[in-house]
Amino acid sequence: MSTPHINANPGDFAKTIIMSGDPLRAKLIAETYLEDVKEVTNVRGILGFTGKYKSKDISIMGHGMGAPSASIYFHELMATYGVKNFIRVGSCGAISDNIHLKDLIVAMGASTDSKINRIRFLDHDLAAIANYDLLQACIEVLKTTTVNYKVGNVFSSDLFYRPNENDYTLMAKYGVLGVEMEVNALYALAAEHQCRALALCTVTDHIVQHEHLTADERRTDLHEMVKVALETAIKI
């Protein structure tokens, strides 16, 4: 049975999915790393695929930009298609002096300026946190690599172009490592639907220091994150 935004058939999705904001990146990941790949959904250009990685069924799918868009796909995958394990791979802007370009942030929790979780949670603040089993599995994988990584909190913003950059000073004071747009929604929906979720963010920009990766560097270093996500996926 399809949903308004996903036209896959029952059973088309694996229990574990890796999600990216960019549907073309999802397509690239699927075609590069999976065997026996099948496209399972393509509504509104949001592409989803299922295949095998080291003999384990894995799905890859896009979700668009921002919490409202991403929440549609997270919800439908959880509520209708029975997907249980979510690993989001994406980029972020660093705000901490201890974080550098190309570092990988493993998002332990997500603060936000969005009201999306308050709407779900009786206008209370929800602690939007990663699943511990996924987090632990990811750290085990990272310890076998040369990837520079930090584990900590991110800030999920509704604004890509923030009008007051002084906000970042306060966030950094509270230990926030980087800013992105979807993690708080993913972790809240995973809690609501008793699923497991983890987000990985490669630092492609340093907001405070005004540093940016080139297009070629983004392509290469995001692949390192994807490999970590895939190896994490087969450990759970």
From Swiss-Prot:
CDD domains given for it? PNP_EcPNPI-like
Q: Which reaction does it catalyse?
A: a purine D-ribonucleoside + phosphate = a purine nucleobase + alpha-D-ribose 1-phosphate; a purine 2'-deoxy-D-ribonucleoside + phosphate = a purine nucleobase + 2-deoxy-alpha-D-ribose 1-phosphate
What Enzyme Commission number does this protein have? Answer: 2.4.2.1
The name this protein goes by in its record: Purine nucleoside phosphorylase DeoD-type 1
* Function statement: Catalyzes the reversible phosphorolytic breakdown of the N-glycosidic bond in the beta-(deoxy)ribonucleoside molecules, with the formation of the corresponding free purine bases and pentose-1-phosphate.
- The active site of this protein is located at D205 (proton donor)
Q: Locate the residues binding a purine D-ribonucleoside.
A: H5, E180, M181, E182, T204, D205
- Originating species: Shewanella oneidensis (strain ATCC 700550 / JCM 31522 / CIP 106686 / LMG 19005 / NCIMB 14063 / MR-1)
Q: Spell out the family assignment given in the record's similarity comment.
A: Belongs to the PNP/UDP phosphorylase family.
Q: Gene3D superfamilies attached here?
A: Nucleoside phosphorylase domain
- Top-level class of the enzyme under EC nomenclature: transferase
- Identify the residues that bind phosphate: G21, R25, R44, R88, V89, G90, S91
Q: Which PROSITE patterns match?
A: PNP_UDP_1 (PS01232)
What Pfam families does UniProt report for this protein, alphabetically? Answer: PNP_UDP_1
Concerning InterPro entries, the annotation shows:
DeoD-type, Nucleoside_phosphorylase_CS, Nucleoside_phosphorylase_d, Nucleoside_phosphorylase_sf
GO CC, one annotated term: cytosol
Q: Oligomeric state and partners?
A: Homohexamer; trimer of homodimers.
* One function term, GO molecular function aspect: purine-nucleoside phosphorylase activity
Entries under SUPFAM superfamilies matching the protein: Purine and uridine phosphorylases
Asked if the Swiss-Prot or TrEMBL record annotates the protein with the keyword Transferase, the reply is yes
Residues annotated as site: Important for catalytic activity: R218
The entry's keywords: Glycosyltransferase, Transferase
Gene Ontology biological process terms, A to Z: purine nucleoside catabolic process
